[in-house]
């Protein structure tokens, strides 16, 4: 059950990257959150503690939901179809994805 749930999240992330508007990277995610943009932040499980604290601080101020995915940044990059690690991503528009429902499950 846990594996299937993880696969659904991975698929939703990939669809959001392919069909929606997603910002990759911690610096760009924090920058957009500070401007009140974004609907959901997804953080890799191995994201640096200080970066994670910054993201949680700014998302609390902007009331943006955060989901900590239990994959590494390298795996999150692969899920996004990128050849580099992704520690955080910010969903601006979900596209055809049901990514915004993951916090409710």
UniProtKB/Swiss-Prot annotation:
Does Glycoprotein count among this protein's keywords?
no
Query: Could you mention a single GO BP entry for this protein?
Result: translation
| Matching Gene3D superfamilies | 3.30.1330.30
Tell me one Pfam family matched here: Ribosomal_L7Ae
What InterPro entries does this protein's entry cite? Ribosomal_eL30, Ribosomal_eL30-like, Ribosomal_eL30-like_sf, Ribosomal_eL30_CS, Ribosomal_eL8/eL30/eS12/Gad45
In alphabetical order, the GO MF annotations are: RNA binding; structural constituent of ribosome
Q: Which GO terms describe its cellular component?
A: cytosolic large ribosomal subunit
Q: Which NCBIfam families match?
A: PRK01018.1
Record's protein name = Large ribosomal subunit protein eL30
Q: Which organism is it from?
A: Methanococcus vannielii (strain ATCC 35089 / DSM 1224 / JCM 13029 / OCM 148 / SB)
Q: Which gene encodes it?
A: rpl30e
């Amino acid at each position: 059950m846990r594996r299937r749930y993880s696969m659904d999240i991975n698929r939703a992330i990939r669809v959001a990257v392919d069909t929606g508007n997603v910002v990759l990277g911690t610096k760009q995610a924090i920058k957009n959150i500070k401007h009140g943009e974004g609907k959901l932040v997804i953080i890799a499980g191995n994201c640096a503690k200080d970066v994670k604290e910054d993201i949680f601080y700014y998302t609390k101020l902007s009331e943006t939901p955060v989901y900590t995915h239990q994959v590494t940044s390298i795996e999150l990059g692969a899920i996004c179809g990128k050849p580099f690690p992704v520690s955080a991503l910010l969903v601006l528009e979900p596209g055809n994805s049901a990514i915004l429902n993951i916090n409710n499950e």
